């Protein structure tokens, strides 16, 4: 999918993108961890950087934050070049990289006070609001060594908010959260975006990215293989239909002989049918329904469905493995 760069990043980050990289590469000896990455993170988006563990996601984030040098390529954060303008670029950036670390013998509030002391005076005034925002106001005066991993993740987000960030960079932020915490986290991210902030979220969890993010880059073995809106990337995949009949065993036989059918699988709701990419989906779906009727099958449910981001991701990465 092509990306229209639109307005290029300008000083202060007033352009269309808050993160832009070109040819960004990082090598560790003979191993290429990040391979020629061109990344464009639109302003005001929830952007998922999606890939399996070991795909180079954390390494890219560390380069954006100036924590490790790139081997080659260029990058801009909020319109400023990193690492040359790192301090100014990161002034309005909040980040969690890997597991957030704190002083265990201090309370959550005291840890934030230590961080705020190194920032502008207004940072201290944001502590209470940040703790409330992440759901830790009732536990803020407990020592962090008593916090669960999920609570430390929340405290890490609170720490990020002390900068009143235009950009939040979160590396695997749902680690350690229970299902209720994950649901609250999704709402929190949506709230940040509604306020005009941009969130760059690195994750290997496809389902979470699809539920949280509106933009995504799919990364595999250090390379960005596709990027764009979640809706467009899923829609670019093979069309599918879900059909349930009076006799799904016979229906499988009908589908097996239809030229438009690529794959089919039985699910609790019926038969999931993936159509070939070279057929016109609407005509093929109509013809499948007609064949079912001619075979004497009663159709209980028939629905054209959108491929999930997970299905699209597996389609892309499996194709890359075959080409390797």
Language model regions located:
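Small/polar loops that bind or transfer phosphate-bearing groups
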Residues: 98, 201, 243-244, 301, ...
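Short histidine/acidic/glycine/proline-rich micro-motifs that form metal-
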Residues: 102-103, 276-279
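Non-catalytic alpha-helical coupling and interface elements of nucleotide-dependent molecular machines
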Residues: 117-120, 214, 260, 297, ...
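Residue-level detector of short coil/turn "hinge" positions at structural boundaries
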Residues: 123, 138, 262-263, 299
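Residue-level "edge-of-site" marker
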Residues: 144, 268-269, 305
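ABC transporter nucleotide-binding domains
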Residues: 15-21, 26-220, 226
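ABC transporter nucleotide-binding domain
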Residues: 186-276
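C-terminal coupling/interaction segments
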Residues: 2-9, 279-324
